[in-house]
Amino acid sequence: MKSPFGGIAETLKPKMEDFKVFLLNQAETFENGVRAAARAAISPNGKYIRPMLVFASAPADADEKSLVRRATIAELVHLSTLIHDDVIDRADMRRNSETAYKKYGAKTAILLGDAIFSHMMSLAFEENSMAVLKKTADCVRTVCEGEIKQTLADRAEIVSREKYYEVAYGKTAALFELACNLGATAGTPPDGWREAAENAGKQLGIAYQIYDDICDWFMTERDAGKTLGTDLISGKQTFPLIALLEKLPAEQSASLAKNLPNEQPEKIAKLMRSFGIPEICAAEFSRRVAAAEESLGKFPAVNTGLLEFCSAMRNLKFG
């Protein structure tokens, strides 16, 4: 399936090629007994969305070597969280390959995620910037807290949209925001650009989480390249389900929320379609992308990459 991000990836091709070489070389820094697992985890099969955001946010005077390192920092944060997510979700497939959890078991996968995270912090230290270290550490904490909040949430209680956005920020948008920050601060941006880029990253991150939620309900595992259906099994109330619960009568809504893990996904997906849930999700997705574009519209001369990224987001297919 053709990537909707192919256009911006082509625009950023020289930088992305340097990044990929640098990223894959990071696996070679691990000890012999860990290197094979690190190579599999730091694979060349990702979409590299977060590194693209780093490059797309950078002012013209950004140092290229620093940018590549910052893009790698963003991707390694993402990879370490994916490894841990797969353990939590007991997922067997990621990026059309077996997950570390499937290959090595939960204990080794958790330690591998920790090792990659630790290596990422070592790279962040090389930036010789307390701001980079603090922003990165704060982001990781926010991501972990977002996952914890969703895991500990009362499954029988109907989650509000506001609560969902809070969790979505922690799970996904905080890392998009970090990537935009790392790019924007790699040079000397005009006043307000960092804040505008960060806000765009936040809005795009929430939009992407909504897209990811939709994939779990309406996309095939072959097209998604990963294990699907884990949200239902774990009883997580993602955006499509929350939108459905809003539409159902109170009694039916409460019953569905309470019995979610025992429900048939096909039955719920059919119900979602009957209530126009995919269209509701698409509308909220578009609203978030528009908010990102509005934030960036005040800085047309800094870097058009983020606006191009917004256009690519609009090409994502909702199942």
List the predicted regions and their residue ranges.
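All-alpha prenyltransferase/terpene-synthase fold signal
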Residues: 1-319
